[in-house]
Amino acid sequence: MARPTASDLRQLSDADVTEQIDGLRRELFELRFQQATRQLGNTHRFKESRLKLAQLLTVQSERKRSAAS
């Protein structure tokens, strides 16, 4: 699966960005739980999820800054 670029994420609506952020935070929680119970097989999903979450949070903060000015 190809990673979405920042320009792809900037085209999402505010509601979609917020929804994806919530989903990724939930996914990271579940991954940490699986890791603690030794049920996690794909450890690379941590990195992918954290990276996408950081990109989405960056897009969200850019929008907040541009709306404030």
Swiss-Prot record:
UniProt keyword Ribosomal protein, yes or no: yes
List the keywords (alphabetical).
Answer: Ribonucleoprotein, Ribosomal protein
Q: Does the keyword Cytoplasm apply?
A: no
**Gene3D superfamilies according to UniProt:** 1.10.287.310
A GO biological process of this protein is: translation
The entry assigns this protein to a family as follows:
Belongs to the universal ribosomal protein uL29 family.
Please identify the protein, giving its name as recorded.
Answer: Large ribosomal subunit protein uL29
Organism source for this protein? Synechococcus sp. (strain CC9311)
